[in-house]
Structures are given as structure tokens and as C-alpha cells.
């Protein structure tokens, strides 16, 4: 049995019968967790264990757990800094910022792995132009090289803990003001302008071995009329062929307003998969998930299944939290990360991405 091309969410802190029915469907290959799915560490570990036990080929479990405003699990987890705080340190001490970024990635990933989560949709590789409120302090910096250096360090820290990284939002969401959760943003720059700036960290992260990518629900009309997540130009010609990316591609949530361009939910899923996504996310609308499961008919290629299988967390890096706390590596990382950026994080804890998933 192999992973299907759909990633769905679940209703609460434990699986209900409808969750089990949906997740057992052959089309489903993953689950994304939200803050509503978390009560405490023991409950999360039990939920992940039950999800993984549903199929012979365990479902992928992913989460948006970046730090700052976007951290689904808080009580019982280390409060991670907003990535902009690492960029501020970079301005004065680049090497120190890289070290802290790697430690942040390690703490992020090791705590998630200890509870059974396979991967986080992180790091954010968008540039901080100061225009986008939905990106904002989720971005490391305005300088493409700084974003790459810090993003690579976070990725390496995640790898140290047995977790693959997923960069987002290809080819860059930071320049537009509109929020793709509630609108369809349009970036009217030329491909040359984008390639000289926003594409740089994505290109360098591909060269550094990034395992997965999430495209933006943004239209770049000078390149293609389709939003990037539905565009064969962006996903096949540029990402796969020109940049040489051979990792997994996850759509952003296809229930967001930025995805409405492609039609109804079944049409959105088909369009995303046809464009080059390996897994399509359908979140926060169980009735739409049921519609997709009833109507979607896809011939799922073996290379896509293989790319997704590489996103499973490494089993050798999944100690219990008790064992993790006794680890010298974790203790050292925690010493550096705990409290980092706390002042800026506490100014605004409203999650700009969790419109329907907020507990």
C-alpha cells in the first residue's frame, strides 16, 4: 500500500468515526494538524500513534509549526521565535544567527518527532518586503542571501532531529499585500525581477537538498495566468526543469480563497495535481473532503509516491520527551532557543494562517 495524493485534517483531539473513514480511503496519504487538534503532549502522541496505525503504509502527519505567530502547539512545547528575530541577529552577527537558526530547527523538529509528527511546513523562504501582513515576521529577512543562509541552517537543524524540511511559498509571497487565505494576490513583476530576488533562496535551498516545497496561491501574470500552485510553468518548467528540484511538492490549502481561481474543490485538486503537486491539501471543510473522495479519479505516478515517502520522520530520531530532555544535544539547543525573540513574539500571537483551524 502506498500514500495517496490527498492530505486532510481531522475534527478534534482524537479521531472520530468520520475521520477514520476518510483517512482510510486509498486517496488519502497525509493528515495536517491544527491547534484545535492539540490539548496536551500525551494526547498529541496518542493521536499521532492512532493516525499512523490506520494503514500499513503510515499516513504522513504534517503541521504548520514555524515559530512566532504560527506555532500550532504551544503549552508543553518550547515557544519558538519568529524568524524575523533571527534576521535581526543576522544584521550584527551572521555566524551567531546561523548557529541559533540551526538550534531553532533542531528544537522545533525534535519536539515534534518526540510526539509522532513527521514534518513541519517550514521554513518560510519568502522575502520580508514589509508589505505582507500574512508573511510579516514569519520571514527571516529582506536579503535573499540572508534568507537562504538562515533557512538552510533551520533545515540542517531539522535534519539533525530526523525531520525533512518544506520551504514555502514558492516562488515568493512576500511582495504582495493581499492575503491568499481570503483573496487572490497578484504579483505583476517580471520573471527577471522575481528571479533576481525572491527565487534566490528557493534556488539555493534546492541546491542544498531541500526535501519539499509548497507553492504560493499567488498569480504572477507576467509569467503565467495561473496561480503558482496550479501552474505547470512554475512547477514543471521552472521548479523541476530549471531549478532541478526532485523533492515533494505540497499544495497550499485548496479551500483558501486564493485557490478559488481553479473552480470547485474537485477541479482545484485535479488542477493542482496536474500542474505538478504531489499532494493536495483540503482543510477545514469535511464536506468538501467527502466530495473529493467521492469524485476524484487519478492515476498516481510512482515518482510522486516515492517523493512523498521520503517525508516520513526518521524513526531513529523519535525519542520520548523524557529521553529528549535527558539529551545533552537538546539541552544545549534549548538553552540557546528558549526566550529567543520572546518579546516580539508576545506582542502578537494571533496566527495569520489558522482561519478555520484555530482552537
Curated annotation (Swiss-Prot):
Main subcellular location of this protein, as a coarse class: cytoplasm
GO CC terms, sorted: cytoplasm
A Gene Ontology biological process term: carbohydrate metabolic process
Active site: 181, 252
Site (Important for catalytic activity): 179
Similarity annotation: Belongs to the glycosyl hydrolase 3 family. NagZ subfamily.
Record-linked Pfam families: Glyco_hydro_3
Reaction catalyzed: Hydrolysis of terminal non-reducing N-acetyl-D-hexosamine residues in N-acetyl-beta-D-hexosaminides
Organism: Thiobacillus denitrificans (strain ATCC 25259 / T1)
Descriptive protein name: Beta-hexosaminidase
Subcellular location: Cytoplasm
Binding positions (substrate): 64, 72, 138, 168-169
Alphabetical keyword list: Cell cycle, Cell division, Cell shape, Cell wall biogenesis/degradation, Cytoplasm, Glycosidase, Hydrolase, Peptidoglycan synthesis
Amino acid at each position: 500500500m502506498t500514500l495517496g495524493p490527498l492530505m486532510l485534517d481531522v475534527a478534534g483531539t482524537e479521531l472520530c468515526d468520520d475521520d477514520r473513514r476518510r483517512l482510510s480511503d486509498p486517496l488519502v496519504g497525509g493528515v495536517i494538524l491544527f491547534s484545535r487538534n492539540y490539548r496536551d503532549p500525551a494526547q498529541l502522541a496518542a493521536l499521532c500513534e492512532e493516525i499512523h496505525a490506520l494503514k500499513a503504509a503510515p499516513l504522513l502527519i504534517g503541521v504548520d509549526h514555524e515559530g512566532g505567530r504560527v506555532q500550532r502547539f504551544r503549552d508543553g512545547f518550547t515557544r519558538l521565535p519568529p524568524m524575523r528575530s533571527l534576521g535581526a541577529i543576522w544584521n550584527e552577527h551572521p555566524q551567531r544567527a546561523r548557529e541559533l537558526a540551526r538550534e531553532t530547527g533542531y528544537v522545533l523538529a525534535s519536539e515534534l518527532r518526540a510526539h509522532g509528527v513527521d514534518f513541519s511546513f517550514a521554513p518560510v523562504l519568502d522575502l520580508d518586503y514589509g508589505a505582507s501582513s500574512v508573511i510579516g515576521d514569519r520571514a527571516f529577512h529582506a536579503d535573499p542571501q540572508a534568507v537562504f543562509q538562515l533557512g538552510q541552517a533551520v533545515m540542517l537543524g531539522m535534519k539533525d532531529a530526523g525531520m525533512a524540511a518544506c520551504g514555502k511559498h514558492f516562488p515568493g509571497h512576500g511582495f504582495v499585500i493581499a492575503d491568499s487565505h481570503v483573496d487572490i494576490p497578484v504579483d505583476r513583476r517580471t520573471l527577471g525581477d522575481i528571479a533576481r530576488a525572491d527565487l534566490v533562496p528557493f534556488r539555493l535551498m534546492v541546491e542544498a537538498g531541500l526535501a519539499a516545497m509548497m507553492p504560493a496561491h499567488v498569480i504572477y501574470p507576467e509569467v503565467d495566468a495561473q496561480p503558482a500552485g496550479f501552474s505547470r510553468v512554475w512547477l514543471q518548467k521552472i521548479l523541476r526543469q530549471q531549478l532541478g528540484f526532485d523533492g515533494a511538492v505540497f499544495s497550499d490549502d485548496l479551500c483558501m480563497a486564493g485557490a478559488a481561481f481553479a473552480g470547485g474543490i474537485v477541479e482545484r485538486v485535479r488542477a493542482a495535481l496536474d500542474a505538478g503537486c504531489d499532494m493536495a491539501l483540503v482543510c477545514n471543510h469535511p464536506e468538501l473532503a467527502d466530495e473529493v473522495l467521492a469524485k476524484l479519479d487519478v492515476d498516481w505516478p510512482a515518482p510522486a509516491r516515492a517523493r512523498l515517502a521520503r517525508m516520513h520522520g526518521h524513526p531513529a530520531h523519535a525519542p520520548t520527551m523524557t529521553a529528549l530532555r535527558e539529551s545533552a544535544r537538546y539541552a544545549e539547543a534549548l538553552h540557546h532557543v528558549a526566550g529567543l525573540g520572546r518579546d516580539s513574539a508576545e506582542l502578537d500571537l494571533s496566527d495569520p494562517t489558522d482561519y478555520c483551524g484555530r482552537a
